[in-house]
Amino acid sequence: MKEGIHPNYEVVAVTCSCGNKFETRSTLGNVLSIDVCNLCHPFYTGKQKVLDTGGRVQKFADRFGMFGTKK
């Protein structure tokens, strides 16, 4: 490998929009701002919204179900 062509891999202070702060390593610089972290992401907090598409499918089948059946 050539010397001097690779970016520096340094410790970076990461700040989330929820206020959580932690350190990691990156080549991006020394400060990084993120929108979502493990403390505020819906998947990790258990506040996920489950989309109910069953109602839409049933509504479609009620309106247009007769077109898909063979006689």
Curated annotation (Swiss-Prot):
One GO-annotated biological process of the protein: translation
GO CC list: ribonucleoprotein complex; ribosome
Any Pfam family: Ribosomal_L31
Note accompanying the cofactor annotation: Binds 1 zinc ion per subunit.
Cofactors demanded by this protein: Zn(2+)
Organism of origin: Pseudomonas putida (strain GB-1)
Sequence positions that bind Zn(2+): C16, C18, C37, C40
Keyword Ribonucleoprotein: yes
Keyword vocabulary terms for this entry: Metal-binding, Ribonucleoprotein, Ribosomal protein, RNA-binding, rRNA-binding, Zinc
Binding partners and assembly: Part of the 50S ribosomal subunit.
Protein name, entry field: Large ribosomal subunit protein bL31
InterPro entries in the cross-refs: Ribosomal_bL28/bL31-like_sf (IPR034704), Ribosomal_bL31 (IPR002150), Ribosomal_bL31_A (IPR027491), Ribosomal_bL31_sf (IPR042105)
Similarity remark: Belongs to the bacterial ribosomal protein bL31 family. Type A subfamily.
Recorded GO MF terms: metal ion binding; rRNA binding; structural constituent of ribosome
